[in-house]
Amino acid sequence: MTLASDFGFPSAISSSFTILEERYHNNFPNTLCVSSGQESMNNNPVPCQVFPLVSGGSSGGNLFSSSSGFCNGVYVSSSSQARPSVSTVPRDRITVAHVSGEGQRQECPVETHSLQLINQPQEQKIMTWSSDQIRGFFDFPVPDPQAASSRTMVSSKEVLSKCEWPDWADQLISDDSLEPNWSELLGDPNVLNLYSKIETQSSDIARQEIVFRNQHQVDPSMEPFNAKSPPASSMTSKQRMRWTPELHEAFVEAINQLGGSERATPKAVLKLINSPGLTVYHVKSHLQKYRTARYKPELSKDTEEPLVKNLKTIEDIKSLDLKTSIEITEALRLQMKVQKQLHEQLEIQRSLQLQIEEQGRYLQMMIEKQQKMQENKKDSTSSSSMPEADPSAPSPNLSQPFLHKATNSEPSITQKLQNGSSTMDQSESTSGTSNRKRVRED
Protein backbone atom coordinates (compact mmCIF):
# COMPACT_ATOMS: atom_id res chain seq x y z
CA MET A 1 0.00 0.00 0.00
CA THR A 2 1.13 3.55 -0.66
CA LEU A 3 0.79 6.16 2.05
CA ALA A 4 2.14 9.67 2.57
CA SER A 5 5.47 10.26 4.15
CA ASP A 6 3.85 11.95 7.13
CA PHE A 7 2.51 8.58 8.26
CA GLY A 8 5.94 7.03 8.09
CA PHE A 9 5.41 4.79 5.06
CA PRO A 10 7.84 4.81 2.11
CA SER A 11 5.87 5.52 -1.02
CA ALA A 12 6.03 7.04 -4.48
CA ILE A 13 3.18 7.95 -6.79
CA SER A 14 3.94 8.34 -10.47
CA SER A 15 1.87 8.24 -13.61
CA SER A 16 4.74 7.68 -16.05
CA PHE A 17 7.06 5.43 -14.02
CA THR A 18 10.13 7.59 -14.23
CA ILE A 19 11.91 5.33 -11.80
CA LEU A 20 12.48 2.64 -14.45
CA GLU A 21 15.30 3.13 -16.87
CA GLU A 22 14.69 3.91 -20.50
CA ARG A 23 16.16 0.67 -21.75
CA TYR A 24 13.24 -1.31 -20.35
CA HIS A 25 10.81 0.93 -22.17
CA ASN A 26 12.75 0.51 -25.36
CA ASN A 27 12.85 -3.27 -25.01
CA PHE A 28 9.11 -3.47 -24.45
CA PRO A 29 7.48 -0.87 -26.64
CA ASN A 30 4.30 -2.85 -26.98
CA THR A 31 3.46 -3.93 -23.49
CA LEU A 32 -0.25 -3.54 -24.21
CA CYS A 33 -1.56 -4.62 -27.59
CA VAL A 34 -4.81 -3.30 -29.00
CA SER A 35 -7.13 -5.41 -31.11
CA SER A 36 -9.88 -3.68 -33.00
CA GLY A 37 -11.05 -6.71 -34.85
CA GLN A 38 -13.49 -7.81 -32.21
CA GLU A 39 -16.32 -5.37 -32.68
CA SER A 40 -19.02 -7.70 -31.44
CA MET A 41 -18.58 -6.43 -27.90
CA ASN A 42 -19.02 -2.78 -28.83
CA ASN A 43 -22.78 -3.11 -28.59
CA ASN A 44 -22.58 -4.05 -24.90
CA PRO A 45 -19.68 -2.07 -23.54
CA VAL A 46 -18.64 -2.71 -19.97
CA PRO A 47 -17.15 0.37 -18.35
CA CYS A 48 -13.90 -0.20 -16.53
CA GLN A 49 -12.09 2.59 -14.75
CA VAL A 50 -8.33 2.73 -15.04
CA PHE A 51 -6.04 4.11 -12.35
CA PRO A 52 -2.35 4.85 -12.46
CA LEU A 53 0.05 2.38 -11.00
CA VAL A 54 1.64 3.08 -7.64
CA SER A 55 5.20 1.95 -7.11
CA GLY A 56 5.87 0.70 -3.62
CA GLY A 57 9.17 -1.07 -3.83
CA SER A 58 8.61 -4.76 -4.51
CA SER A 59 4.86 -4.74 -3.88
CA GLY A 60 2.35 -4.75 -6.68
CA GLY A 61 -1.39 -4.97 -7.26
CA ASN A 62 -4.30 -4.84 -9.71
CA LEU A 63 -4.44 -2.01 -12.18
CA PHE A 64 -8.12 -1.71 -12.91
CA SER A 65 -11.24 -1.38 -10.80
CA SER A 66 -14.69 -1.32 -12.37
CA SER A 67 -17.87 0.22 -11.08
CA SER A 68 -19.11 -3.19 -10.05
CA GLY A 69 -15.96 -3.90 -8.07
CA PHE A 70 -14.39 -6.46 -10.46
CA CYS A 71 -12.73 -6.35 -13.84
CA ASN A 72 -12.57 -9.88 -15.16
CA GLY A 73 -10.81 -8.92 -18.33
CA VAL A 74 -7.55 -7.78 -16.77
CA TYR A 75 -4.86 -10.03 -15.28
CA VAL A 76 -1.77 -8.53 -13.74
CA SER A 77 1.37 -10.36 -12.66
CA SER A 78 2.48 -9.68 -9.10
CA SER A 79 6.05 -10.70 -9.81
CA SER A 80 6.82 -7.70 -11.97
CA GLN A 81 8.21 -4.79 -10.02
CA ALA A 82 7.15 -1.97 -12.32
CA ARG A 83 4.37 -1.46 -14.84
CA PRO A 84 3.60 1.41 -17.19
CA SER A 85 0.64 3.53 -16.23
CA VAL A 86 -2.52 3.52 -18.33
CA SER A 87 -4.08 6.89 -18.91
CA THR A 88 -7.04 6.31 -21.18
CA VAL A 89 -8.50 3.46 -23.22
CA PRO A 90 -10.66 3.79 -26.36
CA ARG A 91 -14.18 2.46 -26.59
CA ASP A 92 -13.03 -0.37 -28.86
CA ARG A 93 -12.47 -3.76 -27.27
CA ILE A 94 -8.80 -4.06 -26.40
CA THR A 95 -6.69 -6.99 -25.39
CA VAL A 96 -3.95 -6.61 -22.82
CA ALA A 97 -1.22 -9.19 -23.21
CA HIS A 98 1.69 -9.65 -20.90
CA VAL A 99 3.88 -12.36 -19.47
CA SER A 100 3.38 -13.70 -15.96
CA GLY A 101 6.09 -14.80 -13.61
CA GLU A 102 6.33 -18.23 -15.28
CA GLY A 103 6.59 -16.85 -18.80
CA GLN A 104 3.01 -17.64 -19.88
CA ARG A 105 1.18 -15.31 -22.20
CA GLN A 106 -2.19 -13.96 -21.04
CA GLU A 107 -4.79 -11.99 -22.97
CA CYS A 108 -7.18 -9.67 -21.18
CA PRO A 109 -10.04 -8.04 -23.12
CA VAL A 110 -10.89 -4.60 -21.69
CA GLU A 111 -13.43 -1.96 -22.74
CA THR A 112 -13.26 1.59 -21.39
CA HIS A 113 -14.67 5.07 -22.05
CA SER A 114 -11.35 6.88 -22.50
CA LEU A 115 -9.86 8.16 -25.76
CA GLN A 116 -6.44 6.53 -26.14
CA LEU A 117 -4.58 3.74 -24.38
CA ILE A 118 -1.20 4.08 -26.02
CA ASN A 119 0.18 5.69 -29.18
CA GLN A 120 -0.38 2.73 -31.50
CA PRO A 121 -2.51 2.36 -34.62
CA GLN A 122 -5.77 0.45 -34.35
CA GLU A 123 -4.90 -1.73 -37.34
CA GLN A 124 -2.08 -3.38 -35.46
CA LYS A 125 -2.94 -6.92 -34.46
CA ILE A 126 -2.07 -8.78 -31.30
CA MET A 127 1.66 -9.06 -30.92
CA THR A 128 3.62 -11.49 -28.83
CA TRP A 129 6.86 -10.98 -27.05
CA SER A 130 9.96 -12.65 -28.22
CA SER A 131 12.26 -14.72 -26.05
CA ASP A 132 15.00 -12.10 -26.37
CA GLN A 133 12.78 -9.48 -24.94
CA ILE A 134 11.66 -11.80 -22.11
CA ARG A 135 15.28 -12.49 -21.17
CA GLY A 136 15.94 -8.86 -20.47
CA PHE A 137 12.70 -8.50 -18.59
CA PHE A 138 13.90 -10.47 -15.59
CA ASP A 139 17.27 -8.68 -15.36
CA PHE A 140 16.12 -6.12 -12.82
CA PRO A 141 18.59 -5.01 -10.22
CA VAL A 142 17.94 -6.10 -6.65
CA PRO A 143 16.35 -3.14 -4.93
CA ASP A 144 17.92 -1.84 -1.75
CA PRO A 145 15.20 -1.09 0.81
CA GLN A 146 17.06 1.84 2.35
CA ALA A 147 18.00 3.28 -1.04
CA ALA A 148 14.49 2.75 -2.34
CA SER A 149 12.98 4.36 0.73
CA SER A 150 15.35 7.34 0.49
CA ARG A 151 14.80 7.60 -3.25
CA THR A 152 11.03 7.21 -3.21
CA MET A 153 10.28 9.46 -0.22
CA VAL A 154 7.95 12.26 -1.18
CA SER A 155 6.71 15.05 1.01
CA SER A 156 3.07 15.22 1.99
CA LYS A 157 2.53 18.42 0.04
CA GLU A 158 3.82 16.88 -3.20
CA VAL A 159 1.67 13.80 -2.69
CA LEU A 160 -1.44 15.88 -2.18
CA SER A 161 -0.59 18.07 -5.16
CA LYS A 162 -0.01 15.11 -7.48
CA CYS A 163 -2.86 12.89 -6.36
CA GLU A 164 -6.27 13.82 -5.11
CA TRP A 165 -7.87 12.14 -2.09
CA PRO A 166 -10.74 10.26 -3.89
CA ASP A 167 -8.35 8.73 -6.41
CA TRP A 168 -6.02 7.68 -3.64
CA ALA A 169 -8.92 6.09 -1.67
CA ASP A 170 -10.16 4.21 -4.75
CA GLN A 171 -6.63 3.05 -5.40
CA LEU A 172 -6.35 1.73 -1.85
CA ILE A 173 -9.65 -0.14 -2.25
CA SER A 174 -8.61 -1.62 -5.62
CA ASP A 175 -5.06 -2.61 -4.53
CA ASP A 176 -6.01 -5.76 -2.63
CA SER A 177 -2.67 -7.46 -3.01
CA LEU A 178 -0.62 -4.51 -1.79
CA GLU A 179 0.97 -5.18 1.58
CA PRO A 180 3.18 -2.90 3.64
CA ASN A 181 6.86 -3.64 3.87
CA TRP A 182 7.29 -3.88 7.61
CA SER A 183 11.04 -4.06 7.38
CA GLU A 184 11.09 -0.70 5.65
CA LEU A 185 8.60 0.72 8.13
CA LEU A 186 10.67 -0.40 11.09
CA GLY A 187 13.87 0.82 9.46
CA ASP A 188 12.45 4.23 8.60
CA PRO A 189 14.08 6.87 10.82
CA ASN A 190 11.11 9.23 10.44
CA VAL A 191 8.79 6.77 12.13
CA LEU A 192 11.19 6.30 15.02
CA ASN A 193 11.58 10.05 15.35
CA LEU A 194 7.80 10.43 15.40
CA TYR A 195 7.43 7.86 18.19
CA SER A 196 10.30 9.44 20.13
CA LYS A 197 8.63 12.84 19.84
CA ILE A 198 5.34 11.43 21.11
CA GLU A 199 7.12 9.74 24.04
CA THR A 200 8.98 12.93 24.96
CA GLN A 201 5.77 14.93 24.82
CA SER A 202 3.95 12.40 27.04
CA SER A 203 6.86 12.37 29.51
CA ASP A 204 6.86 16.18 29.63
CA ILE A 205 3.12 16.22 30.32
CA ALA A 206 3.54 13.64 33.10
CA ARG A 207 6.32 15.69 34.67
CA GLN A 208 4.20 18.83 34.58
CA GLU A 209 1.33 17.00 36.28
CA ILE A 210 3.66 15.68 39.00
CA VAL A 211 5.07 19.18 39.62
CA PHE A 212 1.56 20.62 39.80
CA ARG A 213 0.50 17.97 42.31
CA ASN A 214 3.59 18.52 44.40
CA GLN A 215 2.92 22.25 44.50
CA HIS A 216 -0.67 21.79 45.64
CA GLN A 217 -0.01 18.87 47.96
CA VAL A 218 -0.14 19.54 51.70
CA ASP A 219 1.72 17.70 54.40
CA PRO A 220 -0.78 15.54 56.34
CA SER A 221 1.03 16.22 59.59
CA MET A 222 0.41 19.95 59.13
CA GLU A 223 -3.28 19.64 58.20
CA PRO A 224 -4.77 19.85 61.73
CA PHE A 225 -2.64 22.89 62.53
CA ASN A 226 -3.51 24.67 59.29
CA ALA A 227 -7.20 23.74 59.27
CA LYS A 228 -8.45 24.82 62.65
CA SER A 229 -6.59 25.43 65.86
CA PRO A 230 -8.69 24.50 68.90
CA PRO A 231 -9.31 27.25 71.43
CA ALA A 232 -7.24 27.37 74.58
CA SER A 233 -10.33 27.25 76.79
CA SER A 234 -11.34 23.87 75.46
CA MET A 235 -7.83 22.54 75.98
CA THR A 236 -7.77 23.75 79.57
CA SER A 237 -11.28 22.49 80.25
CA LYS A 238 -10.47 19.02 78.96
CA GLN A 239 -7.47 18.54 81.23
CA ARG A 240 -7.63 15.39 83.35
CA MET A 241 -8.46 15.75 87.02
CA ARG A 242 -8.02 13.26 89.81
CA TRP A 243 -11.08 12.79 92.00
CA THR A 244 -10.04 12.59 95.63
CA PRO A 245 -12.23 10.92 98.28
CA GLU A 246 -13.15 14.34 99.70
CA LEU A 247 -14.31 15.56 96.30
CA HIS A 248 -16.23 12.35 95.76
CA GLU A 249 -17.97 12.71 99.14
CA ALA A 250 -18.90 16.30 98.30
CA PHE A 251 -20.13 15.07 94.94
CA VAL A 252 -22.30 12.39 96.55
CA GLU A 253 -23.72 14.90 99.08
CA ALA A 254 -24.58 17.31 96.27
CA ILE A 255 -26.33 14.52 94.35
CA ASN A 256 -28.30 13.51 97.43
CA GLN A 257 -29.33 17.13 97.99
CA LEU A 258 -30.50 17.39 94.39
CA GLY A 259 -32.64 14.26 94.73
CA GLY A 260 -30.54 11.51 93.21
CA SER A 261 -28.26 10.93 90.28
CA GLU A 262 -31.15 10.95 87.81
CA ARG A 263 -32.40 14.40 88.78
CA ALA A 264 -28.98 15.97 89.39
CA THR A 265 -27.39 18.05 86.63
CA PRO A 266 -23.68 18.84 86.17
CA LYS A 267 -24.19 22.61 86.62
CA ALA A 268 -26.16 22.21 89.87
CA VAL A 269 -23.59 19.77 91.26
CA LEU A 270 -20.78 22.18 90.34
CA LYS A 271 -22.52 25.03 92.18
CA LEU A 272 -22.97 22.92 95.31
CA ILE A 273 -19.38 21.63 95.37
CA ASN A 274 -17.67 25.03 94.81
CA SER A 275 -14.20 23.52 94.38
CA PRO A 276 -11.49 25.44 92.47
CA GLY A 277 -10.30 23.91 89.16
CA LEU A 278 -13.45 21.83 88.75
CA THR A 279 -15.35 22.28 85.50
CA VAL A 280 -18.67 21.17 84.11
CA TYR A 281 -16.96 18.57 81.88
CA HIS A 282 -15.33 16.91 84.92
CA VAL A 283 -18.64 16.83 86.80
CA LYS A 284 -20.49 15.52 83.78
CA SER A 285 -18.08 12.64 83.17
CA HIS A 286 -17.98 11.76 86.87
CA LEU A 287 -21.76 11.83 87.06
CA GLN A 288 -22.04 9.46 84.13
CA LYS A 289 -19.55 7.09 85.76
CA TYR A 290 -21.44 7.32 89.04
CA ARG A 291 -24.72 6.45 87.35
CA THR A 292 -23.24 3.49 85.55
CA ALA A 293 -21.44 2.25 88.72
CA ARG A 294 -24.64 2.56 90.70
CA TYR A 295 -26.74 0.66 88.26
CA LYS A 296 -24.18 -2.00 87.43
CA PRO A 297 -24.68 -4.23 90.51
CA GLU A 298 -28.43 -3.95 90.23
CA LEU A 299 -28.21 -4.80 86.61
CA SER A 300 -25.85 -7.66 87.42
CA LYS A 301 -28.22 -8.97 90.08
CA ASP A 302 -31.13 -8.56 87.77
CA THR A 303 -29.22 -10.30 85.05
CA GLU A 304 -28.07 -13.11 87.36
CA GLU A 305 -31.56 -13.74 88.63
CA PRO A 306 -33.01 -14.16 85.17
CA LEU A 307 -30.10 -16.43 84.32
CA VAL A 308 -30.81 -18.55 87.37
CA LYS A 309 -34.48 -18.44 86.57
CA ASN A 310 -33.73 -19.37 83.04
CA LEU A 311 -31.52 -22.21 84.21
CA LYS A 312 -34.19 -23.35 86.63
CA THR A 313 -36.81 -23.07 84.01
CA ILE A 314 -34.62 -24.99 81.59
CA GLU A 315 -34.06 -27.72 84.18
CA ASP A 316 -37.72 -27.70 85.03
CA ILE A 317 -38.57 -27.86 81.41
CA LYS A 318 -36.21 -30.77 80.96
CA SER A 319 -37.65 -32.55 84.01
CA LEU A 320 -41.13 -31.73 82.84
CA ASP A 321 -40.27 -33.01 79.45
CA LEU A 322 -39.01 -36.23 80.99
CA LYS A 323 -42.05 -36.51 83.22
CA THR A 324 -44.42 -35.70 80.45
CA SER A 325 -42.67 -38.13 78.17
CA ILE A 326 -42.91 -40.84 80.84
CA GLU A 327 -46.52 -40.01 81.51
CA ILE A 328 -47.27 -39.99 77.84
CA THR A 329 -45.66 -43.38 77.41
CA GLU A 330 -47.56 -44.76 80.39
CA ALA A 331 -50.80 -43.29 79.11
CA LEU A 332 -50.13 -44.81 75.74
CA ARG A 333 -49.46 -48.17 77.33
CA LEU A 334 -52.65 -47.97 79.41
CA GLN A 335 -54.56 -46.92 76.36
CA MET A 336 -53.20 -49.89 74.47
CA LYS A 337 -54.19 -52.20 77.32
CA VAL A 338 -57.69 -50.75 77.48
CA GLN A 339 -58.04 -51.07 73.76
CA LYS A 340 -56.96 -54.69 73.95
CA GLN A 341 -59.47 -55.37 76.74
CA LEU A 342 -62.22 -53.66 74.83
CA HIS A 343 -61.36 -55.69 71.81
CA GLU A 344 -61.49 -58.90 73.83
CA GLN A 345 -64.83 -57.91 75.36
CA LEU A 346 -66.22 -57.15 71.97
CA GLU A 347 -65.12 -60.54 70.74
CA ILE A 348 -66.72 -62.21 73.79
CA GLN A 349 -69.96 -60.32 73.26
CA ARG A 350 -69.98 -61.26 69.65
CA SER A 351 -69.45 -64.93 70.47
CA LEU A 352 -72.23 -64.79 73.09
CA GLN A 353 -74.57 -63.14 70.66
CA LEU A 354 -73.86 -65.83 68.13
CA GLN A 355 -74.52 -68.53 70.71
CA ILE A 356 -77.81 -66.89 71.76
CA GLU A 357 -78.91 -66.71 68.17
CA GLU A 358 -78.11 -70.40 67.68
CA GLN A 359 -80.03 -71.34 70.83
CA GLY A 360 -83.04 -69.33 69.71
CA ARG A 361 -83.02 -71.06 66.38
CA TYR A 362 -82.78 -74.43 68.12
CA LEU A 363 -85.72 -73.65 70.42
CA GLN A 364 -87.82 -72.50 67.50
CA MET A 365 -87.08 -75.72 65.69
CA MET A 366 -88.05 -77.74 68.79
CA ILE A 367 -91.36 -75.89 69.14
CA GLU A 368 -92.17 -76.44 65.53
CA LYS A 369 -91.42 -80.12 65.87
CA GLN A 370 -93.70 -80.41 68.92
CA GLN A 371 -96.52 -78.68 67.16
CA LYS A 372 -96.16 -81.00 64.22
CA MET A 373 -96.15 -84.01 66.52
CA GLN A 374 -99.32 -82.83 68.31
CA GLU A 375 -101.06 -82.27 65.04
CA ASN A 376 -100.07 -85.70 63.90
CA LYS A 377 -101.34 -87.20 67.16
CA LYS A 378 -104.67 -85.41 66.86
CA ASP A 379 -105.06 -86.56 63.34
CA SER A 380 -104.30 -90.14 64.34
CA THR A 381 -106.74 -90.09 67.30
CA SER A 382 -109.53 -88.61 65.28
CA SER A 383 -109.05 -91.13 62.53
CA SER A 384 -109.04 -94.08 65.01
CA SER A 385 -112.13 -92.96 67.04
CA MET A 386 -114.43 -92.33 64.08
CA PRO A 387 -116.24 -95.59 62.77
CA GLU A 388 -116.68 -96.24 59.18
CA ALA A 389 -120.20 -95.12 58.18
CA ASP A 390 -122.21 -93.82 55.37
CA PRO A 391 -121.42 -90.47 54.14
CA SER A 392 -125.08 -89.48 54.79
CA ALA A 393 -124.79 -90.33 58.48
CA PRO A 394 -124.31 -87.41 60.79
CA SER A 395 -120.94 -86.81 62.05
CA PRO A 396 -120.28 -88.19 65.48
CA ASN A 397 -120.44 -85.79 68.40
CA LEU A 398 -118.56 -85.77 71.57
CA SER A 399 -121.82 -85.07 73.58
CA GLN A 400 -123.15 -88.62 73.05
CA PRO A 401 -121.56 -90.10 76.15
CA PHE A 402 -123.03 -87.35 78.25
CA LEU A 403 -126.50 -88.06 76.82
CA HIS A 404 -126.06 -91.73 77.49
CA LYS A 405 -125.24 -90.95 81.07
CA ALA A 406 -128.25 -88.68 81.30
CA THR A 407 -130.53 -91.41 80.04
CA ASN A 408 -129.07 -93.76 82.57
CA SER A 409 -129.79 -91.27 85.35
CA GLU A 410 -133.38 -90.50 84.24
CA PRO A 411 -135.18 -93.08 86.53
CA SER A 412 -133.53 -91.72 89.60
CA ILE A 413 -134.69 -88.24 88.74
CA THR A 414 -138.23 -89.38 88.17
CA GLN A 415 -138.21 -91.18 91.44
CA LYS A 416 -136.99 -88.06 93.18
CA LEU A 417 -139.71 -86.06 91.53
CA GLN A 418 -142.36 -88.55 92.59
CA ASN A 419 -141.07 -88.52 96.12
CA GLY A 420 -141.14 -84.73 96.13
CA SER A 421 -144.70 -84.60 94.96
CA SER A 422 -145.79 -87.05 97.64
CA THR A 423 -144.10 -85.00 100.27
CA MET A 424 -145.83 -81.91 98.95
CA ASP A 425 -149.13 -83.56 99.15
CA GLN A 426 -148.49 -84.65 102.66
CA SER A 427 -147.46 -81.16 103.65
CA GLU A 428 -150.51 -79.69 102.01
CA SER A 429 -152.75 -82.12 103.75
CA THR A 430 -151.21 -81.41 107.04
CA SER A 431 -151.44 -77.67 106.46
CA GLY A 432 -155.10 -78.00 105.49
CA THR A 433 -156.00 -79.91 108.56
CA SER A 434 -154.20 -77.41 110.72
CA ASN A 435 -156.02 -74.59 109.10
CA ARG A 436 -159.41 -76.28 109.67
CA LYS A 437 -158.63 -76.77 113.29
CA ARG A 438 -157.80 -73.05 113.69
CA VAL A 439 -160.96 -72.06 112.01
CA ARG A 440 -162.99 -74.24 114.25
CA GLU A 441 -161.41 -72.87 117.33
CA ASP A 442 -162.31 -69.35 116.27
Swiss-Prot record:
**What is this protein's name?**
Myb family transcription factor PHL13
Task: Specify residue ranges for compositional bias: Basic and acidic residues.
Answer: 370-380
Q: Name one Pfam family in it.
A: Myb_DNA-binding
- Do you know which Gene3D superfamilies this protein is assigned to? Homeodomain-like
Entry keyword annotation includes Calcium: no
Q: What broad class describes the main subcellular location of this protein?
A: nucleus
Any one Gene Ontology molecular-function term assigned to this protein's record: DNA-binding transcription factor activity
Keywords on this record? Coiled coil, DNA-binding, Nucleus, Transcription, Transcription regulation
Report the record's Gene Ontology biological process terms.
regulation of DNA-templated transcription
Give compartment(s): Nucleus
Residue ranges of DNA binding: 266-291
Its encoding gene is what? PHL13
Q: Where is this region: Disordered?
A: 370-442
Question: According to the UniProt entry, where does the motif LHEQLE sit in this chain?
Answer: 342-347
